[in-house]
Amino acid sequence: MRKLFFCGVLALAVAFALPVVAAPKAPADGLKMEATKQPVVFNHSTHKSVKCGDCHHPVNGKEDYRKCGTAGCHDSMDKKDKSAKGYYHVMHDKNTKFKSCVGCHVEVAGADAAKKKDLTGCKKSKCHE
């Protein structure tokens, strides 16, 4: 009976630990995105409460996380490009299938004016330098 109990506890421990071990390692902080007029320094550690899939989307049905501006993804740097290829659009549009940076920040800031300025402002915000 003890062996069976021990095996059950061990199986549960492995089952709960597996997703943590299998999760992709986030890139180092200080990722500088310079495709916009005002560069953004992105820190994954600041966003650790957000699931990878909340920002990154599957590529060919796989969770193949890549940089947003990777060739074939959001590689159109034309600010007026409102398609899914438009880099500016996917970062700033509040109504995309996957949450944009600004869309998520608006939600997080809520009605707090100071947070709104910090998280959604173009100049002197916590995003743009």
From Swiss-Prot:
It comes from the Bacteria. Heme c 3 binds at residues 47, 101, 104-105. Residues 1-22 form the signal peptide. InterPro entries: Cyt_c_III, Cyt_c_III_dom, Multihaem_cyt_sf. The keyword NAD does not apply. One of its GO terms (molecular function) is metal ion binding. Heme c 1 binds at residues 44, 52, 55-56. Heme c 2 binds at residues 57, 68, 73-74. Participates in sulfate respiration coupled with phosphorylation by transferring electrons from the enzyme dehydrogenase to ferredoxin. This is Cytochrome c3. It comes from Nitratidesulfovibrio vulgaris (strain ATCC 29579 / DSM 644 / CCUG 34227 / NCIMB 8303 / VKM B-1760 / Hildenborough).
